[in-house]
């Protein structure tokens, strides 16, 4: 790798001129990782998968071919393909909760590792071999168990996972993009999300809600000639291009968008954080970002109605800002909406967008549509008085917008892949913007890392 000094021709091997130019532009503008040790591991709700306690020792369960039931032939096959670099080994990991809610790793031979914290209330490194090394050929493997909240990870080096005792049992502490001191912080990695149910239905997606890292694509082949679903994701050099766009945006509006780019100690960007993830590190940097836009929205809909198409039995509901400065919606919506903060808009799950247990169906339907309208900054456009109505060509046009989401969708090869939690809110008749594949009759789920397949 090249540090920021005049490089020799030898040092340029493996680096593009675009990357070197970006290093120079981003010097001092990017967030920089400083990986630490086990004492720097943070245990948070965001990076801990909580399962039931199964014992004080790690267990390995091997699948014996002769002992499989006949119906196991219908189990899902997982195929992992390295298109990143034929000369470089990529480590894959398959994690999740099994049908009994226990943390599990699935290895290449179909064996399952059930790690244990041993009752430790401080994180304990998982030392068992759980990585699946990928060279220039694909790895096909059975998925012998239901997997809930699953992830298929890919990394340029070894990722470190930990176990810790929790009030509910045993929890797995996963690498965190929100901790610049995480032991795995300097490694370029990414994951696809996967749920495989006891009934053998599969739901998988490529998401950029938290960050953009290694580039992933996926395909789901279905049984009984039901065809193949595919998601091609982002272009290969998306991280470099997004970071270049972030620097430009910082120059335009003065907000530290470039800080969303996370670089290693050479200045090379390895991932881009979402505004919501970045807010965990530096909550004040975008604290007032949306204030002006929200004020303008509130003033407009104090005078004229905002219509939310719930796309449900409730149909369209009319909303208006009340004298006490709360947005109130009709149709039986059980409570109003206060002005959202930047934190509320980035995450779509706090403040006026938080779902409470007693919220009725109308309120639950309004939340995602209202938050999506803010993130995409469509509320003040002509035609934006009905949400959702405008198509994707109108998104992110206002100066106040999620430029993280904008750049992602500009670089997606097919325009699909979540860039924020409610990116699946679409006007009726418009293409699905989410990066989801799903089937009740799955045969093979293929996940690619690197160059998107044709």
Write out the residue ranges for each language-model feature.
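Extracellular low-complexity, O-glycosylation-prone Ser/Thr/Pro/Gly-rich "stalks"
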Residues: 22-454
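Fungal secretory targeting signals
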Residues: 1-33
